[in-house]
């Protein structure tokens, strides 16, 4: 019994290490491709921080998902929802709004589900969606 507990503890520790490594590498390298966008958030004092995020286009709206543990950018945009969005040839100011309507959330999740292995690698974080509404 003691040996089993020890093995389970080691396995859990290794798993936590893999999650931390995976999340750290994604945050450090910020991989870009045709399905990503650059989201610039502004801290108080107007310090810009650029994050590369997966772009979700759903029912004529643009979204990003908050589905990793490192999410300082998300806390920043909750304080200041004015952001800059760039992808492809597009570059525009927007207002970031947390999606709270359960039907809208369900619709996006149905359209863009996460695979089990991605959720495993990221440590099963909660998933939120942010709608990016172009500023006029």
Where are these regions (language model features)?
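Short, structured beta-strand-loop surface elements
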Residues: 42-49, 69-136
